[in-house]
Amino acid sequence: MVHLVDSNPGHITKAERAGLEGIVANIYNTDLSERYELLDVGYLLAFTSSDEVNDYALSRYEKIFGESGAYRLITVDELKGRMTPSEDSVFSYTEDFINLSESNRESAIVREVAFTTTAQLLELMAHAAADVDIAPLFIKYPDGQLHVIPKDPTVFEITTATTCHLVYMGSELPATTGAHQKTEPEEEER
């Protein structure tokens, strides 16, 4: 279950229309640790346009809601190389809030494309880097689990005869040789 916490009731209404659980709350004023709806949260994702809010969300709630992982968006200074991002809490090393917003504006469809080797993943990441309207999000393992893309994708190891998927948003990526592409993976699996 995905829960969106936001102080803007309009954002919560949109999230609920999309099938998410929404809580209208200000993380600075509200103690979310007492909210029963959030007791089963394993991942914390701080995805606001404010670096300060993202940092605050992690520092205040990571130990409560981030038992399986806690991530924030990369800052502009980290993205531009003016600061070094922390290795353990950055969701994407290539996409900040603006980049994700632009990819969503281009195409809000979540897509996935298969790859069977690290070389194919690197090829896909290079295509994504060359197109500002593509935002890589996760690597999907054969068991369906989603994992954050490592800072250095060359370290990603894939076992022989295994097909993983790059999950991304935005324009369509070309399929790698011998791989196939799916659009809106959640819809096709139903």
Each model region followed by its residue ranges:
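Cytosolic regulatory regions of ion transport systems
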Residues: 1-190
